[in-house]
């Protein structure tokens, strides 16, 4: 059975400034592809109006929370900057039994209605229903929200479609006992297919607003191209622009010739890029652009936008963390097991897997003191604490889509470099950890999180068997999903409960409770600059469980050190290494009275003559490398 719900999707082409919200909304299968959705006959008052919206009119999907009898509010943002009125709506109909339907306009999502119209049926599925306001409403310069409210009779009653875009989808829902509150889901789902009908449009010769500026994260002295989006409401075609670029007070004028002319009309979208060389000093730089001319004519309005460029001392690899919510009692969790095992096998240098077993307390690997990270069901995962995903399907419905989700998140350049060494103490009652955190840009506020995980965990005991619902399905019913077919009928794991070998299982951490992390915190007040290194040490007590002790003695325990941004909650970078056994930390041996150490380096790779506090990297005469921590 293929998974048809998306928990959250976040595009990371540009750095995000707020933490992604968790959501109860789910998307059903896209069943209406290739259909041009019919528009009911317009009222006379809607003649000569122009539809505006973000969603597709040819490919609809449906969204809901999987329950009926729910009251939904759905809205889009209609930008200002255009002299026009809103005369009515094209209301997309999925649920023919919906009740208490109204359309409305508001200056804020929680504000009073500027205009409202009740709507009665009959409602025809897969059609736009046109609704006219009694009087046109003037579109204000600051824009407004256009939406509709209804009580559903189907589980997935909201029409969505097209490419995700800012302003495209705002949602609220309520039941008799609960209200979700408004949320911006524009970067998690396709936009609403709702349209407003604009009338009395008066275009200026030239009118433009910037919609985005994707300032990059990059190394010092590096060439860049920055994309800028805009919306034109101009009576003339646009061929070229003149802009002033201000980076941290340094202003440069640039002439931009558009790759394709922007046609005259309302809400015409375009994009251009401008290039340059990043500053020679690491830091955070405001990038502001202001529009000066269009087609050589001085621009009389005001159009500008700002982004933040992060300039790093150097580029280092990112290790991306996938934290999975799972448990032996979860019948659909075999797909999470398949996805995590695939990532571990195929991305050993960049994947940090952490499986926290909290689904059922009867699970021998159950670990209480770990945050659920907003995940409400298993299997589920969070990638770098930025985006929720399915640990097999990722952000969509594709087999092993977790790979694409991981690669997308792994593209972002980290602001810190992390080097780690860890060892069991002599009696193996605790793991001693040393981490060197190099700041590639001056830190603002961050925390360190330490997590012990164990590999190769298995047992023939009944309590260790993994529940499996997929044994009821054929391979075709899971779209012949690699690895997943093994749990289906006639597969090697095609039984209701199966023996597995579990990896990346949490057995200890710096969390003293599910919400309290005991790891170190570093802020801007500590005085660290770009290029400086924070030396951290930490100790985690060993698990008292027999199976965890066995994993430790067999050398199957890893330590992951994560650096979390305290403002966003995102993981900035991480490093996962194997915990060395006590014998690995004895003094460097010598042969025939001669040491086999040939060189010693600090965490930054600089040669040092004597041991220094923190992580020391020792190169041996035989070419091997050892990591030693000095407290």
Features from the language model and the residues they span:
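C-terminal tail/sorting-segment detector
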Residues: 3, 20, 615-631
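Residue-level detector of functionally pivotal "anchor" positions at catalytic/ligand-binding pockets or at interdomain
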Residues: 41-65, 197-219, 311-320, 570, ...
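Intrinsically disordered, low-complexity Pro/Gly/Ser/Thr-rich segments with frequent PxxP/GP/PP motifs
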Residues: 251-279
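Beta-sheet-rich sandwich/jelly-roll-like modules and their strand-loop junctions
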Residues: 23-108, 149-206
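Short, well-structured beta-strand segments enriched in hydrophobic/aromatic residues
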Residues: 129-166, 284-291, 445-454
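Short, solvent-exposed loop/linker segments at the N-terminal edge
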Residues: 216-222, 424-428
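Local sequence-structure signature of Cys/Sec-based thiol-disulfide redox active-site neighborhoods
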Residues: 314-349
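Short, conserved sequence motifs used for protein processing/export or organelle targeting and
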Residues: 349-582
């Amino acid at each position: 059975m293929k998974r048809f719900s998306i928990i959250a999707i976040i595009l990371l082409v540009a750095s995000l400034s707020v933490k992604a919200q968790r959501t109860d909304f789910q998307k059903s299968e896209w069943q209406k592809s290739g259909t041009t959705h019919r528009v009911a006959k317009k009222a006379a008052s809607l003649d000569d109006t122009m539809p505006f919206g973000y969603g597709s009119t040819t490919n609809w999907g449906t969204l809901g929370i999987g329950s009926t009898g729910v009251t939904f509010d759905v809205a889009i943002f209609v930008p200002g900057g255009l002299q026009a009125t809103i005369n009515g709506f094209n209301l997309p109909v999925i649920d023919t039994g919906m009740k208490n339907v109204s359309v409305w306009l508001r200056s804020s999502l929680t504000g009073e209605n500027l205009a409202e119209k009740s709507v009665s049926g009959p409602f025809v599925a897969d059609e736009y229903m046109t609704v006219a306001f009694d009087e046109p409403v003037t579109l204000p310069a600051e824009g407004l929200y256009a939406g509709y409210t209804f009580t559903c009779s189907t589980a997935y009653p909201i029409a969505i479609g097209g490419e995700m875009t800012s302003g495209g989808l705002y949602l609220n829902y309520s039941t008799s006992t609960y209200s979700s509150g408004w949320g911006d889901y524009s970067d998690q789902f396709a936009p609403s297919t709702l349209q407003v009908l604009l009338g009395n449009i008066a275009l200026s010769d030239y009118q433009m607003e910037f919609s985005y500026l994707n300032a990059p994260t990059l190394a010092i002295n590096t060439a860049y191209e920055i994309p800028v989006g805009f919306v034109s409401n101009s009576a003339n075609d646009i061929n070229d622009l003149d802009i002033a670029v201000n980076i941290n007070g340094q202003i440069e004028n640039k002439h931009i010739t558009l790759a394709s002319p922007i046609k005259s009309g309302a809400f015409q979208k375009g994009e251009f890029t401008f290039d340059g060389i990043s500053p020679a000093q690491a830091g955070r730089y405001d990038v502001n652009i202001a529009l000066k001319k269009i087609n050589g004519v001085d621009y009389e309005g005001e159009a500008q936008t700002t982004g933040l460029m992060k300039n790093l001392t150097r580029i280092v690899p990112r290790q991306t963390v996938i934290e999975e919510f799972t448990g032996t009692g979860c019948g659909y969790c075999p797909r999470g097991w398949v996805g995590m095992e695939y990532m571990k096998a195929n991305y050993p240098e960049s994947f940090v897997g952490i499986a926290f077993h909290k689904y059922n307390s009867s699970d021998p690997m159950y670990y209480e003191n770990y945050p659920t990270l907003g995940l409400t069901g298993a299997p589920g995962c969070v990638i770098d604490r930025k985006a929720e995903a399915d640990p097999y399907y990722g952000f969509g419905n594709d087999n092993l889509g977790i790979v694409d989700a991981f690669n997308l998140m792994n593209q972002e350049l980290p602001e810190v470099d992390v080097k780690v060494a860890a060892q069991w103490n002599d009696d193996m009652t605790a793991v001693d950890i040393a981490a060197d955190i190099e700041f590639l840009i001056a830190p603002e506020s961050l925390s360190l999180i330490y997590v012990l995980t164990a590999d190769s965990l298995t047992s023939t005991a009944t309590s260790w068997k993994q529940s499996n619902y997929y044994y009821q399905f054929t391979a075709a019913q899971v779209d012949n999903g690699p690895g997943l077919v093994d749990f289906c009928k006639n597969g090697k794991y095609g039984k209701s409960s199966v023996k597995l070998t579990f990896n990346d299982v949490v057995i200890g951490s710096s969390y003293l409770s599910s919400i309290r992390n005991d790891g170190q915190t570093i802020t801007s007040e500590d005085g660290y600059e770009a290029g400086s290194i924070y030396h951290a040490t930490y100790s985690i007590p060993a698990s008292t469980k027999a199976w965890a002790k066995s994993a430790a003695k067999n050398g199957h325990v890893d330590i992951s050190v994560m650096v979390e941004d305290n403002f966003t909650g995102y993981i900035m970078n991480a490093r996962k290494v194997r915990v060395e056994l006590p014998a690995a930390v004895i003094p460097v041996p010598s042969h025939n009275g001669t040491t086999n150490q040939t060189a010693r380096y600090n965490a930054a790779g600089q040669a040092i003559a004597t041991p220094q506090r923190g992580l020391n990297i020792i190169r041996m005469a035989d070419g091997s490398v050892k990591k030693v921590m000095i407290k």
